[in-house]
């Protein structure tokens, strides 16, 4: 019998309609039956937002990466998906993949909002090569500038007087895999407090920038979107950049991938703890999201292991493998069958995995992301000066 206790009082089952346990200290959200007379109401500008989206293809795996959702969908719908345009460019450090979701039908199938998503893949990024990190930061800056201009009707934001950017580092700074956002917020070059006092001829390539790390609901008792909405109303920025940790479907993407998008972000969605959205509709200004995958769901690892077990070496028949037919059948698809998922759900349903060196990854990746944002917003600053600032 599910019960919740507060101040020594017991709340019976029938009154408890939702109980979402936090991952990494996010929150414990209790929605009570109307008979208890709850008077809480969300912010009016946030009421229309949906709390949950289906995973691509109706599968059981969550991913925040549009490129992974597209890969899963292609396996069930074929290589050409109406309303989804993709392009991959090879680079010296890896690749850059662009996914454009152009129709509502494609957005529902993909489980992603309509818009543009850019994925930067650098498989050797965890090796802590400084030159490689600078290359990725510069690539991130170029893509970020392109997204900003596209969302400002191709306007040159560097030439707009008093153009102000608010950088929001989302996440729980007490949980290392979720600390990417706060770390980045502490490393970007903030200039808003001195920009207005600097003579125009001495501003050079600096733009007005401010940063905030609003924390999470479990730490502050305030929705992240509500904090940012209040700051936006006071600071009145022209652009908001949100940085957050993401959940991936593939272990190989942990610490090697950076995603940009112009659709905003749903904090906590990757670990099943979706909060109110931070989007252009809620804030009234363009919102660019930058995310780095740091966790993967345990169910994904199980599926990958079964897939490896089901792959027969070339020239050996399935019967000679010695494995049960069930495993080979399971390994035939990219996701676990519903029966297997239901069997594992009590044990692995909410379990997420992160690398043991995630503290090092978080520090290095926050340097890369902060460096890219600094490059994009302050083009006249010398490269060496930017990296000295990050030290």
Question: Each predicted region: which residue ranges?
Answer:
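A structural-propensity feature for long, helix-poor, extended segments
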Residues: 204-231
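Short glycine-rich or small-residue beta-strand-to-loop segments that form or flank ligand, phosphate
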Residues: 119-123, 164-174, 211-215
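Gly/Ser/Thr-rich loops at beta-strand to alpha-helix junctions
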Residues: 170-178, 218, 245-249
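N-terminal amphipathic/basic leader segments beginning at the initiator methionine
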Residues: 19, 29-111
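An N-terminal, well-structured beta->alpha segment
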Residues: 104-152
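A structural signal for small-residue-enriched, beta-sheet-centric alpha/beta enzyme cores
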Residues: 212-213, 242-390
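Glycine-rich phosphate/diphosphate-binding loop of Rossmann-like nucleotide-binding domains
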Residues: 172-207, 211
């Amino acid at each position: 019998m599910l019960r919740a206790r507060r101040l020594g009082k017991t709340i019976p089952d029938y009154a408890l309609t939702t109980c979402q346990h936090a991952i990494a200290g996010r929150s414990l959200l209790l929605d009570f039956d109307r008979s208890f007379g709850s008077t809480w109401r969300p912010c009016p500008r946030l009421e229309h937002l949906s709390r949950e989206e289906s995973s691509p293809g109706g599968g059981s795996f969550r991913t925040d990466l549009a490129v992974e959702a597209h890969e899963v969908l292609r396996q069930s719908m074929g290589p050409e998906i109406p309303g989804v345009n993709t392009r991959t460019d090879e680079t010296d450090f890896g690749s850059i993949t662009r996914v454009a979701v152009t129709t509502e039908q494609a957005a529902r199938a993909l489980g992603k909002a309509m818009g543009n998503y850019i994925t930067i893949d650098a498989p050797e990024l965890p090796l802590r090569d400084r030159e490689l990190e600078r290359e990725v930061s510069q690539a991130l800056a170029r893509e970020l500038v392109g997204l900003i201009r596209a969302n400002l009707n191709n306007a040159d934001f560097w030439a707009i007087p008093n153009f102000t950017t608010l950088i929001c580092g989302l996440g729980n700074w007490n949980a290392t895999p979720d600390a990417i956002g706060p770390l980045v917020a502490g490393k970007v070059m903030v200039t808003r407090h001195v920009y207005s006092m600097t003579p125009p001829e001495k501003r050079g390539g600096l733009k007005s920038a401010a940063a905030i790390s609003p924390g999470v609901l479990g730490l502050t008792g305030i929705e992240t979107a509500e904090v940012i909405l209040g700051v936006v109303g006071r600071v009145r920025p022209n652009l908001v950049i949100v940085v957050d940790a993401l959940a991936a479907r593939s272990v190989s993407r942990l610490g090697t991938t950076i995603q940009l998008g112009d659709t905003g972000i749903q904090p906590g969605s990757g670990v099943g703890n979706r909060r109110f959205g931070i989007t252009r509709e809620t804030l009234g200004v363009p919102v660019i999201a930058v995310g780095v995958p740091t966790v993967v769901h345990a169910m994904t690892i199980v599926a990958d292991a079964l897939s490896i077990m089901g792959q027969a070496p070339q020239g050996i028949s399935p019967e000679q493998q010695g494995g049960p037919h069930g495993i080979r059948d399971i390994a035939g698809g990219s996701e676990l069958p519903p029966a297997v998922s239901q069997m594992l759900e009590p044990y692995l349903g909410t379990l997420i995995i992160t690398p043991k060196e995630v503290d090092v990854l978080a520090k290095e990746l926050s340097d890369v992301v902060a460096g890219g944002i600094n490059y994009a917003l302050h083009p006249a600053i010398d490269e060496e000066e930017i990296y000295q600032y990050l030290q």
